[in-house]
């Protein structure tokens, strides 16, 4: 077997595995984030999705206010976690599951999760805390989806 064929075969198998995983695995971390938002944020997830330049998919430019800045920090947090604590995973960190619960009004990340899950949970906890701390700055005109 030629080295080129072997390399091609390995790349093809890896690509197929990644595609299958993306199609059939639910985005668990996103589901956790949605659940956390529904449970602990002062506003509904729909009020944040499409808000400013960073809330929702992607993000670029300058945040329009403190709520949008929360989303920019969250995007950066996921990027850092993807490179560090979750770097051993082939898949996107948005597919990684973690456990959390509420203690009164406080979000608590499960210390039994691995470093990756704990770090992702902290990113999500921090954005919910940031949303709630900056709720007075929320401006519906900045929401491209429902505004």
UniProtKB/Swiss-Prot annotation:
InterPro entries: PLipase_A2, PLipase_A2_Asp_AS, PLipase_A2_dom, PLipase_A2_dom_sf, PLipase_A2_His_AS
Ligand binding (Ca(2+)): 56, 58, 75
Enzyme Commission designation: 3.1.1.4
Propeptide: 20-28
Tissue: Expressed by the venom gland.
Primary location recorded for the protein, binned into one broad class: secreted
Cofactor annotation: Ca(2+)
Alphabetically ordered keywords of this record: Calcium, Disulfide bond, Hydrolase, Lipid degradation, Lipid metabolism, Metal-binding, Secreted, Signal
Disulfide-linked positions: 55-71, 70-130, 77-123, 86-116, 109-121
Record's subcellular location: Secreted
Gene3D superfamilies: Phospholipase A2 domain
Active site (catalytic residues): 74, 124
One protein family per Pfam: Phospholip_A2_1
Entry-linked PROSITE patterns: PA2_ASP, PA2_HIS
EC supergroup of this enzyme: hydrolase
Gene Ontology terms for molecular function: calcium ion binding; phospholipase A2 activity
Cofactor note text: Binds 1 Ca(2+) ion.
First and last residue of the signal peptide: 1-19
Gene Ontology, cellular component aspect: extracellular region
An example Gene Ontology biological process: phospholipid metabolic process
Reaction catalyzed: a 1,2-diacyl-sn-glycero-3-phosphocholine + H2O = a 1-acyl-sn-glycero-3-phosphocholine + a fatty acid + H(+)
Job of this protein: PLA2 catalyzes the calcium-dependent hydrolysis of the 2-acyl groups in 3-sn-phosphoglycerides.
The family this protein is said to belong to: Belongs to the phospholipase A2 family.
PANTHER family linked: PHOSPHOLIPASE A2 FAMILY MEMBER, PHOSPHOLIPASE A2-ALPHA
Protein name: Phospholipase A2 SSD387
Organism, as annotated: Scolopendra dehaani
């Amino acid at each position: 077997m030629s080295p080129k064929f072997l390399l091609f075969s390995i790349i093809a198998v890896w690509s197929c595995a990644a595609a299958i995983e993306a199609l059939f695995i639910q985005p668990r971390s996103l589901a956790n984030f949605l659940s956390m938002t529904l449970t602990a944020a002062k506003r509904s997830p729909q009020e944040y999705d499409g808000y400013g330049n960073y809330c929702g998919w992607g993000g670029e430019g300058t945040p329009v206010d403190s709520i949008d800045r929360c989303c920019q920090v969250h995007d950066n947090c996921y990027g850092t976690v993807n490179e560090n604590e979750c770097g051993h995973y082939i898949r996107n960190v948005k597919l990684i599951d973690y456990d959390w619960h509420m203690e009164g009004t406080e979000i608590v990340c499960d210390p039994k999760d691995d470093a990756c899950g704990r770090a992702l949970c902290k990113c999500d906890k921090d954005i919910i805390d940031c949303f709630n701390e900056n709720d007075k700055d929320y401006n519906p005109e900045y929401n491209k989806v429902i505004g």
